C-alpha cells in the first residue's frame, strides 16, 4: 500500500501584532510631510491610543486619523489639535491606522506613536485556528490567554506564563488551536512588550 500524509490546511494564514507600552514613533518616524509615512500601523489585536509628538509648536494645525476602531470597523477621527512641544492623544482607540493627515504645513517634526494598549482583543471573530505566536518579554511577569468566543468569559485554548526577559515561542501543534467561536486574546501582567500571532483568516 501507499502511505498518504495528511497535512493541515494552512492557506490564508494572517498575522496580527500585540503591542504594549508607550512608543512615540511606532507608527510614523519624525518628519515634516503633511501626510505621515506609516511604519508599524497595525493591524493590532489589542486596540491602541494613537499619539502625536513634536518638539515644536503645531497647535495651529489639526490632524485626522483614518483606520479601524477597537471593533475592527472603519473609522475616521475628529480633527485633533497638534502638539505644542509635547504629546497629544487622538480620541478613540485603534486596531489599525491607514493614514494620518495634517491640515497644513508642519512646524518642526511630527511623529505618531501608541500608548495604553488594551489588555484584551479580537484575533479573529469567526471560526479559526491559531497557528503560532512569537514575541519578546520585558521586565516583570505575566500570563497570556488565547480564548474561544470571548476575551473575558471564553474557554481557554492556551495559557502561557511569561517570565521577565524570556522569548515567547510556545509549542502549538500542526493542527493549531481551534477556536470555533472566534479567537480572543487576554493578558495579565507586565512582561509582554510585543507579540505576533498567526491565525487562519
Predicted regions and their residues:
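Surface-exposed, low-hydrophobicity beta-strand/loop segments enriched in small/polar/acidic residues
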Residues: 3-201
